[in-house]
Amino acid sequence: MSKAQYALVGDIGGTNARFALVARDSFELEHIQVLPCNDYANLDEAVRDYLAHHPEAEVHEACMAFACPVHGDTIKMTNNHWTFNKADMQARLGFDTFKYVNDFTAMALGTLHVADERLQKVGGGEGKDGAARLVIGPGTGLGVSGLVRTMTDWAPLSTEGGHVDFAPTDEVEISVLRILKERFGRVSVERILCGEGLLNLYRSLCEIDGVEPAHTQPSQVTEAALANSDVIAHKTLKLFCAIFGRVTGNAALTLGALGGVYVCGGIIPRFIEFFRDSDFRQCFEDKGRMRDYLGGIPVYVVTETYTGLLGAAEALKNQEVH
């Protein structure tokens, strides 16, 4: 009996490696499994362990997303011990095709295949068919990418947009900038719009108000804000959403993202209702004479758990991803 033809897709983070199989000409993820990276010496051990549980699948193609730079001949994970030469790894695994993409590039490509029920709309009209899309997401850092339609496919834009300068707009934000500038020298928006950035913002607001910080983890700040049990934590989360709105609006203007904005990452989906009620949308649109332009752009919060795997499946078949 012949085996079924599948491709292997992966989303490799610092802690976990997520794997799935996709059938030819399909984007449906099958046999999703999450493996702890620390349980394996390197990628090939994890892949072999995963495939050993699916002997019915014949796999000759693979695409994987990595939470680290992927240009060059060597993959060196930022937050775990895995490191390998690309050509050697492909030979060891015996794949005819093996594509490597950055994790946020995969996230951007994955938004093309997220089901409608996993998209939470936050204002705006309808996205323009074929127009550029912005994909942005606070998580461990601030990922910024885009999707531009070509003659054949959607081309992902790899950017370092999370490292643009933080531009304060009122006295409180100016004070935050001064405090963070003393600590970091240059202050990018990522110093505020990520997990550690939320903590930076909280500590700055505590310093402005002359109180000792009560929380030491970003999750503690979020929990206290949502429970309305800490005034400064609540103020922190509100300001986080407002600053994120301005930064997202700037990025949408730069890209011309009339196709819509897709908010990914692990932070915003944890408090969608708070986010929806925050000043995010107002600050997103607050661009003077460009207000109407931004007012029509829809913003979607992506709640799909495996967007990166969907993106790896897209990248494997996408002619714009090499």
Curated annotation (Swiss-Prot):
It comes from the Bacteria. Keywords: ATP-binding, Cytoplasm, Glycolysis, Kinase, Nucleotide-binding, Transferase. ATP binds at residues 10-15. Signal peptide: none annotated. GO terms for biological process: glycolytic process. It catalyses: D-glucose + ATP = D-glucose 6-phosphate + ADP + H(+). One of its GO terms (molecular function) is D-glucose binding. It holds the Pfam family Glucokinase. The keyword Transcription regulation does not apply. Belongs to the bacterial glucokinase family. This is Glucokinase. It comes from Hahella chejuensis (strain KCTC 2396). The gene is glk.
